[in-house]
Each structure stands twice: as C-alpha cells, then as structure tokens.
C-alpha cells in the first residue's frame, strides 16, 4: 500500500498537504480508494464552505458504495478540483495527485497523523 511520507493523514482516510499558496489540499488515501473500488462520483464541499474537523463535508461514490468525506481540520474551502467532476476515476489512478478540495485552516494544523502513524492505524 502506498503511504507517502511527505503527507499527513486523518483517521478517516484523508491525506492533506500544504500547497504553494499557503492553503492545504485534501484527498482520499490509496487505502480508501482501494476499499471503495471504481469511483464514479465526487461531491466536494463548495468554495466558501466552513469546515469543522471530523464533520461530513462531501461524498465519494463508487460502483459498490458511497463514503462521506470528513473535514480534516477547521477552516474554509478555497477551491475544488473541477477535473474530478468529469473524471472522478483519477482518484483510483492517482490518489495522491487527485486532490478533492483545498482549504485554508483556521489555525495551525494539529491532530493529523504522520505516514508511520497512519500505517500503524491500518495495522
């Protein structure tokens, strides 16, 4: 299983990383996309949406099931990856490049997992 060292993770199987503009990108992990199977639809939170850490903020649907996206941190959504509206399967092909939304954290990020901690969580 692919768990890049340069990312941070949530127990709800999201990865996050800062971008060059000081915002953070969020997407689902390789483990999550593997469990979901072939992804057919992504409902990202709209720009301007207020995020509350751990609360549902979007949805990923596959041919097998659907799964809520849970906000990784408190903050405000700044953009969504519009390409995923047309080609949601990009998440299956490249889960760590296919970010779902970007956001501006309300405060310094805390409570995120390192790659080693996420790997341990998965067992």
From Swiss-Prot:
Cofactor requirements of the protein: (R)-lipoate
Q: Looking at the keywords, is Nucleus present?
A: no
| Gene3D superfamilies given in the database record | 2.40.50.100
Q: Which pairs of positions does the record mark as disulfide bonds?
A: none
Task: Indicate the quaternary assembly.
Answer: The glycine cleavage system is composed of four proteins: P, T, L and H.
Summarizing the function annotation, the protein's role is: The glycine cleavage system catalyzes the degradation of glycine. The H protein shuttles the methylamine group of glycine from the P protein to the T protein.
The protein's name is: Glycine cleavage system H protein
């Amino acid at each position: 299983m692919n768990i890049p060292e340069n990312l941070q993770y949530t127990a709800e199987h999201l990865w996050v990383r800062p971008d060059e503009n000081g915002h953070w990108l969020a997407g689902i992990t390789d483990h999550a996309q593997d469990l979901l199977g072939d992804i057919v639809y992504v409902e990202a939170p709209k720009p301007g949406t207020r995020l509350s850490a751990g609360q549902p903020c979007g949805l990923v649907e596959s041919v097998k099931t659907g799964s809520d996206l849970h906000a990784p941190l408190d903050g405000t959504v700044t953009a969504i990856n519009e390409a995923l509206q047309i080609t949601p399967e990009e998440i299956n092909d490249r889960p760590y490049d296919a970010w779902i939304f970007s956001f501006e954290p309300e405060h310094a990020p805390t409570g995120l997992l390192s790659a080693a901690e996420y790997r341990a969580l998965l067992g």
